[in-house]
Swiss-Prot record:
Family: Belongs to the UPF0227 family.
Source superkingdom: Bacteria
Name assigned to this protein: UPF0227 protein KPN78578_10770
Gene3D superfamilies recorded: alpha/beta hydrolase
One Pfam family from the record: UPF0227
Biological source species: Klebsiella pneumoniae subsp. pneumoniae (strain ATCC 700721 / MGH 78578)
Length: 180
């Protein structure tokens, strides 16, 4: 089972395309929708929904995957639910760059202070990070500088922030998922 979390643009047709691409790895791909506008509510909702899906699956090696803001959540929810994560261009600083787009961006900073101390150290090697050198929305190098101590980083030379085509990375994702 692969759980897919969309980014800030929840209505983008690219979400369906990514789900279709992920089905080449595992036919059981489940998209969880969330508001993107209310971080504390989103966290509770995502934890509940992911836990429910994990209770109902026979897959002993599930994967949670997210793009952009979905990558932010996939890393944290995956850690809390003890499943591997794959993130594409994760928005690691939504409290800085979501100003004016969501109601309470400061809630992201609050969530970070309430998260497990050094959670990335405890999550070491359980998240695969794919960053685009062409990301027009986020500073990919800043993300790499923060994450490379803990996770494998794969650089993509062609995709933009929304990462429409993940297919060049599917075999690596599949191998990562099978590690459990």
């Amino acid at each position: 089972m692969i759980i897919y979390l969309h980014g800030f643009d929840s209505n983008s047709p690219g979400n369906h395309e990514k789900v279709m691409q992920l089905q080449f790895i595992d036919p059981d791909v489940r998209l969880i929708s969330y508001s993107t506008r209310h971080p504390k509510h989103d966290m509770q909702h995502l934890l509940k929904e992911v836990d429910k899906m994990l209770q109902l699956t026979a897959d002993d090696r599930p994967l949670i995957c997210g793009v952009g803001l979905g990558g932010y959540w996939a890393e944290r929810i995956g850690f809390l639910c003890d499943i591997r994560q794959a993130v594409f261009n994760p928005n690691l600083f939504p409290h800085e760059n979501m100003e004016g787009k969501i109601d309470r961006p400061e809630e992201y900073a609050d969530i970070a202070t309430k998260c497990v101390t050094n959670f990335r150290e405890k999550n070491r090697d359980r998240c695969l990070v794919v960053l685009s050198r062409q990301d027009e929305a986020l500073d990919s190098q800043r993300s790499a500088d923060l994450l490379h101590h803990y996770y494998e980083i794969i650089w993509d030379e062609e995709q933009t922030h929304k990462f429409k085509n993940i297919s060049p990375h599917l075999q690596r994702l599949k191998a990562f998922k099978t590690l459990g």
